[in-house]
Amino acid sequence: MFNRFNKLQAALALVLYSQSALGQYYTNSSSIASNSSTAVSSTSSGSVSISSSIELTSSTSDVSSSLTELTSSSTEVSSSIAPSTSSSEVSSSITSSGSSVSGSSSITSSGSSVSSSSSATESGSSASGSSSATESGSSVSGSSTSITSGSSSATESGSSVSGSTSATESGSSASGSSSATESGSSASGSSSATESGSSVSGSSSATESGSSVSGSSSATESGSASSVPSSSGSVTESGSSSSASESSITQSGTASGSSASSTSGSVTQSGSSVSGSSASSAPGISSSIPQSTSSASTASGSITSGTLSSITSSASSATATASNSLSSSDGTIYLPSTTISGDITLTGSVIATEAVEVAAGGKLTLLDGDKYVFSADFIIHGGVFVEKSKPTYPGTEFDISGENFDVSGTFNAEEPAASSASAYSFTPGSFDNSGDISLSLSESTKGEVTFSPYSNSGAFSFSNAILNGGSVSGLQRRAESGSVNNGEINLENGSTYVVVEPVSGSGTINIISGNLYLHYPDTFTGQTVVFKGEGVLAVDPTETNTTPIPVVGYTGENQIAITADVTALSYDSATGVLTATQGNSQFSFSIGTGFSSSGFNVSEGTFAGAYAYYLNYGGVVASSATPSSTSTTSGATNSTSGSTSFGASVTGSTASTSFGASVTGSTASTLISGSPSVYTTTLTYATTTSTVVVSCSETTDSNGNVYTITTTVPCSSTTATITSCDETGCHVTTSTGTVATETVSSKSYTTVTVTHCDNNGCNTKTVTSECPEETSATTTSPKSYTTVTVTHCDDNGCNTKTVTSEAPEATTTTVSPKTYTTATVTQCDDNGCSTKTVTSEAPKETSETSETSAAPKTYTTATVTQCDDNGCNVKIITSQIPEATSTVTATSASPKSYTTVTSEGSKATSLTTAISKASSAISTYSKSAAPIKTSTGIIVQSEGIAAGLNANTLNALVGIFVLAFFN
């Protein structure tokens, strides 16, 4: 029995031993003492898969670890890092030395100078990335290795390594980056790793080491490549306690004096190149060209098509190094597919056959070029500026003919001093402007602008855009389909907009000091013409416009012209519509009520080289120059719901933002606005100044009526409800315009009716002339004429003729406008007598006066009968009598008065000429860290052994136990 008990005891001991062995295989735990020092070594000589046993150190605040890498061709270099004092995590440094493994080069800055290190890799890592560099004391693991293309570049802390493509300033951190901070100790002050001059394929990373970095989540790569999102590389900061230690973080910096691109997937090349290994980028690899503060050419070498993805620059605008690097032998810049997010200046002519985009905040300055061609997409969300730095230059040829020309930012060209005509051609497949396009072209010889059909919800501004010599000029659209204008078009400094095809929408055309020429007025719909100064609205008599064209600010000084003989002119005082008739065609303009019907007249002249009839007004200027048409809404929709009645239809404003029939309620109710988008502008109409809403969101009045206020414009002749909005909502005030007329010009005009007779009969025409500017004293006198009837008899009989002679000049002191004297002259000849009216121009004067002139020459007629052998003939002899004095009164027409309408609206622009700082853009690619599995290879083998023991060994042990028990 005792023997059996001994056997049973031995069997139980065997079972317990087996169970202990199985438990060891099934658990993956290891017990590591706190505050221990662990050394980890790995080899990487030619190894594709490296098995390394890396023990997990418990997280404590004072752990110092040393990581040593042994390579095939260099001595061991190890360094230990002082513990971090500012973080509970342990900051460690990975020291690297030796030669490149599998062609990958990771740039590592070490606390101590690593001499002759042309390429360094992180210890604990291999080219295959199968093992991970573990930060001692950190909970972050599994960081993938850094794999870069094989260019020999390295940076020693505090010094420039021979053969390096760029020198990193030790201790400097990238501008705008989340700077690598030294914690606890300063390791040679190196806080940035530079990878430059290399073309990245697959992935790239740089590891900062040699400094104790605590809490920093970025490695600053000055002029280095950011990791491609699909690559496995990462920017890892050794000693970082951040879980983002595997993140790919790229930031532009100021190291080496260059600013790098922050665009993901771009390769930034520094000011110098290494053995030509990085001078060109292979097709399909995106690269960037930085605008460097240094004078070195950026990305010197060949830039092949399709390799350029972005052009950036530092915040401080530098010289056009990009243009040098992109220039051809003839000085022309051939721009590949490009996105511009910084401040770039290209000097010289530019040809772009691939898409070019200026991102929001980006700025592209085209300087001193004679020719610009954009034959692919041209997208402008930022700003494009055409500028000249020379005192003399020829006019620019600018051609945009790609598929899309989309402007939501600013396009501005300034070249008024050009010695030859500027020529801008905007003929893309799709032309959409929601921003601001402004062209100030050649002044000496007016510039030409050609447009394809456009969609405009922003602003066009043209100065000096016209052709001389009477040909069709200005902004011309040559296409079958029409344009849509829901914004503003401003014409000044003699600019003429020739509208050949249909224009629709609800926009405004402001004639500031230019002209608008409509060839087909019936297809010019929904637009409001606003006179803001002197100019002409001209219409071709090709068709009758069924809807009157709304015209704001017509005074007669700014004229309406018809390029055909006008046979009748009428004004409806009830509707405010002025109608000109030419044959069977009629042309009507809604100029507003308040004009005098007797003040209108027609005069002849020329416009754009063609004979034209001007519709003039010489009466009192209407107190309201607003059109009565309801088709004057501009820029935005005015909507009402329910049966709301409106007491004032406020239409046709002078606001620079938008014009139109802004609807206001007839009841003085308080408007409640929800989340308004508001800004106000001050409108000046004659002497009435009002602050009105330019933009206000959906509004509900006290009666429950919901409508949208977009622009409210006061009418000077009616009581209008003007709504203003601020942070507290929308409010109602009432303003009544009181100005009837205001003379703002010293110019005056004299109108004379002239009757001209010829073989076809007599025609009566009205001639209007401009009086000279007022002077204080002018000595002059009108010419006067005396008419005498003379009867002349000869062998053929007697004829009566009328002789008109000029009276001598008289002298008087007067200030008067130009005047005219009309005399009726009867002329008789062999065919009979005809009566003609002769009108002559009086000298200048500026006020009404009565003048005393010397008497005109007069004649005495005597009848003489002469007889000879043939008989008697009766002849009449006329002789001059002495001069007498007479009084001639010259009365000038009363000068015209005008009302000037000015407005000054505030203009909100969200994207103008903002300069993008390259350091402000940070692209981050991160992936979550996974817990470390220790002894990974052993676990796989252990689980295999345990699986076998589970079935076989356990059965054998049970059998031994039974035998021992029964024996």
UniProtKB/Swiss-Prot annotation:
Keyword annotations from UniProtKB, A to Z: Cell wall, Cell wall biogenesis/degradation, Glycoprotein, GPI-anchor, Lipoprotein, Membrane, Repeat, Secreted, Signal
Modification note: The GPI-anchor is attached to the protein in the endoplasmic reticulum and serves to target the protein to the cell surface. There, the glucosamine-inositol phospholipid moiety is cleaved off and the GPI-modified mannoprotein is covalently attached via its lipidless GPI glycan remnant to the 1,6-beta-glucan of the outer cell wall layer.
Sequence ranges of the Sequence repeats: 93-105, 106-118, 119-131, 132-144, 153-165, 166-178, 179-191, 192-204, 205-217, 218-230, 234-247, 248-259, 266-278, 745-780, 781-815, 816-854, 855-893, 894-902
Sites carrying sugar chains: N28, N35, N493, N601, N638
Residue span(s) of the pro-peptide: 947-967
Subcellular location: Secreted, Cell wall; Membrane
GO biological process: fungal-type cell wall organization
Biotechnology: Probable mannoprotein called haze protective factor from wine that is able to prevent visible wine protein haze formation. This mannoprotein showed haze-protective activity against wine proteins and BSA when either was heated in white wine.
Region of interest (4.5 X approximate tandem repeats, Thr-rich), residue spans: 745-902
Residues making up the signal peptide according to the UniProt record: 1-23
Record region (Disordered): 72-301, 836-857
Covalently lipidated residues, kind GPI-anchor amidated alanine: A946
Family: Belongs to the SRP1/TIP1 family.
Protein name: Haze protective factor 1
Organism: Saccharomyces cerevisiae (strain ATCC 204508 / S288c)
Lineage per the UniProt record: Eukaryota, Fungi, Dikarya, Ascomycota, Saccharomycotina
